[in-house]
Amino acid sequence: MDLLHKAKLAPLLPGVYIFYGKNKEYIYVGKAKRLRNRLLSYFNRSNGKYSKKIQAIVNEAEELDYIVVSNEREALLLEANLIFNHKPKYNVMLKDAEFYPYIEITKELFPAVQIVRIRSTGGEYFGPYTDVKFVKDLIDCLQQVYQFRTCRRDMSKSTKPCMEFYMHRCAAPCTGDLEPDSYINSSIQPLRRVLNGDISETLDLIEEKMKKHAKMMDFENAAKYRDLLVKFENVMQRQGVVLEQWRNLDVIGRFKNSYAVLRIRGGHVVGKLSYELDSTKLEDFIFHYYMVGKNELPEAVILERNINFDAEIYFGRPRDKLEEELLHKARENAKNQAYTSGLRKDLLNKMVKVLNLNRYPMKIEGFDVSHLHGKLTVASVVVFFDGLPRKNEYRHYRFNSDRIDDFLTLKELVKRRYSKHELPDMIFVDGGTGQINAVVEALMEIGKECDVVGLAKQNEIVCTRFGELILPFDSPILRTLVRIRDEAHRFANSFHRKLRRKSALSSILDEIPGIGPKRKKKLIEAFGSVKNIRSATLQEIAEVLGSRKLAAEILSRL
C-alpha cells in the first residue's frame, strides 16, 4: 500500500503518526488533532506550509503508520516519548538543545565533575549554559577551591595520584585514602550550592584562605588566592546579577516558533538559551523543555500568560515590574532568534539553487587533511547543522601511511566514515576538482551518492560536480563555505599540533636510559608535552616515575 493511500485511510481522530525510512528506522514523528487531514497535507504541494523538510520526509519515507489516542494531551505525551526514545532525524523539536553544555556530577562513589553536551541517565546535571568558556572558567575556579576530580579513572582500584593532586586541584580519591562521605561533603556539596546560585560561601572561603596565608607571611599563596578571588568574581559578573532578592526563575519568551529561556539562579543569569520548535504553542514548548528535555524546574516559570499544569511550581505572568522587564528581554531574544533562523534558512535555500544541490543542506560535513611531509597524517570532520556548527559531532581520523597524497587520504577517510555513518546532505572539501573527484569515487566504491562541494585555495573558487563558480567576495554562500573550511582546518591543525608535541616528547624520552615503554606512557599521560615537563618540579616528575634519580636525569636533559 503506498503512503498516500494509507494517509487517505487514516481516521479523523487525534493521534500520532510515524514516517519510517529504511530498515523501519524512525525518520519523523508528529501529532495531529485529525490524523487524516494532517497526513494528506504531506502530499499536497499547493499547501502553503509545504516545505523542503516535508518534501525530504516524503521522498525518504518507505512506510507510514499512526496510533489513535483519546485526546490531544495524550498525543503530546506519546509524541514526546517516541521522539525521546527514537530521535528521528527530521524532528527538530527543541533544535539546538545539543549545542548547549551542561555540568555533570557523575553518579559514582567518588563523583567526578564533567562538562558534557549530551546527557545520559546516570548523572546529576546543571544547566544548560550558553557560554562554554564561562563553564570552563567556573569549573577551573571551583576546582582550585574544592579539589573535586575531573578525570575518568576507575575508582575501584587504588592508584598513584596524577598531576592534579600535586597542583592542589584534586583531593585524589584514587589513592584509597579518602572516605566517600568526606570527599562528597568537602568537594561535591559546596559545588552543588554554587551551581544552585549560592556563591557567598565560596567567596568567603577564598577570602579567608587569602587572609590566612597573608597572616602567615606566605605572600605567594596569598597572592594566588587574591587572584582566584578576582577571577571568580569576574566569572560570575560575566553572567550578570539581575535580582537583588534570592530568586530562582526561568523566564520564557516566544516569537512565532522561536523561544528564548532566561535561566536565573540565585539572582544571576546563568543561561540565555534559544530554541526552535515545530509547534507555536507555548504549552508544547514547556512540555518538551521540562519533560522531554529533563531540564531542572526552578521555583517559578514566568510566561506571557498563566498556564495551569497542576504543579506546585508557578507557571504564569510576571508578578512584579522586574519580572516584566525580564520577560521583555526574553521576547527580544526569541525575536532575534527567529530573525537569524530565517536568514539561515534563506541562505541554505539559495545554496540549493546556486550550487545545484540535490538536497536541502540541513547537515553539511566538512573535511580537511593535515600532515608534516607525509608524517602524522590526520583528517578532521566538522559538522554544520542548519548553518551552525555542531561541535559534539566533530571527529578526528588518523592514518598510518607516510605518503604525501591528499587524494588517497580523502578516499580512505570517506570509506572509513560512510561505511559506518549515515551520509550528510552535503560534503564539503578543502580543495578543487581533484579533491571532489576523490570523494565521489570513494562514495561510488561503497555504493553511495552525495552532493560534494569544494573551495579552491587560490582565489576562493567554488567547485561543484558541474564545474567552477566565482562568487562575489561578500556572497553569504561564499562566506559560509569559507567558515566551514576554516573550522575544518582549525580542528585538523589543533589535533596535529597535539600529536607533534607527543611525538617530540616520545622521541626525547627514547634517548634517556631507564625510560621504557611503561614509564614513557606515564610521562606522556601526566604531562603531555616537553614544555609541561620543563615547568614541572623534580618532586612532581619523581612522583609519576617513582624515582628521583630518573626525574633528575630528565630535567637535566631538557
Curated annotation (Swiss-Prot):
One of its GO terms (biological process) is nucleotide-excision repair. The keyword DNA damage applies. It comes from Pseudothermotoga lettingae (strain ATCC BAA-301 / DSM 14385 / NBRC 107922 / TMO). Its main location: cytoplasm. One of its GO terms (cellular component) is excinuclease repair complex. NCBIfam families: uvrC. Coiled coil: none annotated. GO terms for molecular function: DNA binding; excinuclease ABC activity. This is UvrABC system protein C. It comes from the Bacteria. The gene is uvrC. SUPFAM superfamilies: C-terminal UvrC-binding domain of UvrB, GIY-YIG endonuclease, RuvA domain 2-like. The UvrABC repair system catalyzes the recognition and processing of DNA lesions. UvrC both incises the 5' and 3' sides of the lesion. The N-terminal half is responsible for the 3' incision and the C-terminal half is responsible for the 5' incision. It is found in: Cytoplasm. CDD domains: GIY-YIG_UvrC_Cho (cd10434). Belongs to the UvrC family. Interacts with UvrB in an incision complex. Residues 12-92 form the GIY-YIG domain. Residues 200-235 form the UVR domain. Keywords: Cytoplasm, DNA damage, DNA excision, DNA repair, Excision nuclease, SOS response. InterPro entries: GIY-YIG_endonuc, GIY-YIG_endonuc_sf, GIY-YIG_UvrC_Cho, RuvA_2-like, UVR_dom, UVR_dom_sf, UvrABC_protein_C, UvrC.
